[in-house]
C-alpha cells in the first residue's frame, strides 16, 4: 500500500481536509447529543414538534402515505424494543436442564433493563422523522396508495403487537415503567437535638 492510500489520508500522511471536516462535524453533533442527554422532556417535546410538522406537511401535500406508514412501523418497532427487557425471561426459563436449587427469591428486586434505552429510542425516533421529512421532498417516494387501507393495517398491527407485549409482561411479571427500588421512609423526628 502506497503513501496516502488509506481512507481519509492525503499524500503526505495527514488527514485530508474532507476527512477532518466530517470528523469535526461528527464531534460537534456528538457534543450536542451529550449536552441534550439530561433534558428528557425538552428532547421529547422537540421530537413531538417535528412529528407534528411532518404530519401537517403530509396532510397539506396529500401524499407520501407509504413513507408515513413505514415511519409508523419503525416507531412501533422502536417502542416495542423500548418496552422489552434486555434479557428475555422466556429464554432464561426455557434453559432449564432439569431440577436445580433455587438461587434467588421471587420477590427479590431486579431492576428493569431495557433492550432499547430511552435516549437511543428518542434519537432513533427523531432521526426517523427527519428521514421521512426528507423523503417528502422527492416524488419518487410518493407511491399512490389508498391510505385508509394503510391506516387499517397499522391499527391491526399495533393492536396485535401490543396485545402480545402486554401478555408477555403479565406472564413474566415485569413493568417497564418502574423508577427503581421502592424506598421506605421512617417517621420524621420532631424532637430537637441536644448538644452535649
From Swiss-Prot:
Task: Check the record and name the InterPro entries matching this protein.
Answer: Rer1
Q: GO cellular component terms?
A: cell surface; endoplasmic reticulum; endoplasmic reticulum-Golgi intermediate compartment; Golgi apparatus; Golgi membrane; plasma membrane
Give a yes or no for keyword Acetylation in this entry: yes
- Where does the sequence pass through the membrane? 41-61, 63-83, 140-160
Among the Pfam families in the record, one is Rer1
Picking any one GO molecular function of the record gives: acetylcholine receptor binding
The way this protein sits in the membrane is described as: Multi-pass membrane protein
Its BP terms in the Gene Ontology are: positive regulation of protein localization to plasma membrane; protein retention in ER lumen; retrograde vesicle-mediated transport, Golgi to endoplasmic reticulum; skeletal muscle acetylcholine-gated channel clustering
Where is the protein situated, by its record's location annotation?
Golgi apparatus membrane
Keywords from UniProt, A to Z, are: Acetylation, Golgi apparatus, Membrane, Phosphoprotein, Transmembrane, Transmembrane helix
Residues modified to Phosphoserine: 2, 6, 10, 95
Q: Which family does it belong to?
A: Belongs to the RER1 family.
- Briefly, what is this protein's role? Involved in the retrieval of endoplasmic reticulum membrane proteins from the early Golgi compartment.
Q: What is the official name of this protein in its record? A: Protein RER1
Which organism encodes this protein?
Answer: Homo sapiens
Amino acid at each position: 500500500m502506497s503513501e496516502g492510500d488509506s481512507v481519509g489520508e492525503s499524500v503526505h500522511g495527514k488527514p485530508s481536509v474532507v476527512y477532518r471536516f466530517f470528523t469535526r462535524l461528527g464531534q460537534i453533533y456528538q457534543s450536542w447529543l451529550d449536552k441534550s442527554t439530561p433534558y428528557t422532556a425538552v428532547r421529547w417535546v422537540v421530537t413531538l414538534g417535528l412529528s407534528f410538522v411532518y404530519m401537517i406537511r403530509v396532510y397539506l401535500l396529500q401524499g407520501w402515505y407509504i413513507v408515513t406508514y413505514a415511519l409508523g412501523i419503525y416507531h412501533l418497532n422502536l417502542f416495542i424494543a423500548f418496552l422489552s427487557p434486555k434479557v428475555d425471561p422466556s429464554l432464561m426459563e426455557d434453559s432449564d436442564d432439569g431440577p436445580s436449587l433455587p438461587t434467588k427469591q421471587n420477590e427479590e428486586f431486579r431492576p428493569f433493563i431495557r433492550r432499547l434505552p430511552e435516549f437511543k429510542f428518542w434519537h432513533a425516533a427523531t432521526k426517523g422523522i427527519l428521514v421521512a421529512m426528507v423523503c417528502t421532498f422527492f416524488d419518487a417516494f410518493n407511491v399512490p396508495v389508498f391510505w385508509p387501507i394503510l391506516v387499517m393495517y397499522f391499527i391491526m398491527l399495533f393492536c396485535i403487537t401490543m396485545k402480545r407485549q402486554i401478555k408477555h409482561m403479565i406472564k413474566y411479571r415485569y413493568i417497564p415503567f418502574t423508577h427503581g427500588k421502592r424506598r421506605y421512609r421512617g417517621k420524621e423526628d420532631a424532637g430537637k437535638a441536644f448538644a452535649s
